Amino acid sequence: MLNVKSKINTILHRPSIVKSILYKRNINEIRSDLDKIENYEARQFISYLKQSFPYESNAFQRPKLNRLCSLEDWNNDEIRQILSELQMLTHPIIIHRKQWEWAMGILAMKRFNKLNDKCRAIDIGAGREEVLFYLANHLKHVYATDLYGELDKWDKSAPSTFLNNPRKYAPFPYKEDALTVLKMDGTKLEFPSETFDIAFSFSSIEHFGGRNHEGAFQSMKEIERVLKKDGIAVIATECIINDKDDPEFFNKKTIYSDLIDKLDSLKLVEPLDLRITNKTLDTVMDIETAANWDNIDTSFRETHPLILLRSRTILFTSVMLVFQKK
């Protein structure tokens, strides 16, 4: 759950809302006013960022690995090729940041010559992600780990039925003997040290709990342990782009202080670029709409990229972190 402090602070700094509460104004009207104020604040920040720090990405250049998601990436040939292999280049294309996480993860594996039938991989917080079936067709073996069926709020993403019947969820044929699904805590990986060539996780570690993202850090320490020397960790997580704090999502400070700077043998393969392009800033969408994405009319999804999200006054998107074990 996103931090409620931003909501409380917004109320306390808006006398009109406080007055409405004191006079017992209709709660739905109060919520509506609050949302308008929070939306205004978020869009003011976007306007400031676009004017003060304009940034455009060249879709024809070789993509960097460690960075924020950009709308322009869907025009990059390398990324489009991977999306095509994942059968995600629909016509017209529907743009979703989850596609980007998977494509960038595969791109990193290719760059480091790990996408082959000699490499073993582990997915932490795997759920029932479609990328698992793609990787099972390209790697020696993939282990998908998650708390399947244990947490009600994640039952749709990590159903207990995936444990025994992953084939039911496969979008295309895959090597069934190359995928093993295990119920396992991402902060306590039940494997010997130096077992895997690849460890990957897509928008999961931020949900592992603990103060100062302790759960995410413990998961990364376990990844550090089970990776072989020169193995790679491909991690997508959520990053706040404005000056806000949250107990789950990282921001531009805590992604270093609570994660990157605390690791020992895992090192970023290149500097992290936390700039966001102007075109990506234009895609901002409220989180309630995004949460209902699968039920939204196709025509809306075709014209509204799901990349940058707003929850209250918090603006966040996906960030890719690629590490190598030294």
What is the meaning of each model-derived region?
Residues 184-199:
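A short acidic, Gly/Pro-enriched loop at the edge of an enzyme's catalytic core
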Residues 214-229:
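A short glycine-rich, Lys/Arg-flanked "PGG" loop and its adjoining helix->strand segment in the class I
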Residues 244-279:
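Conserved Class I S-adenosyl-L-methionine
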Residues 122, 129-188:
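Class I SAM-dependent methyltransferase SAM/SAH-binding core
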Residues 57-116:
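Class I SAM-dependent methyltransferase Rossmann-like catalytic core
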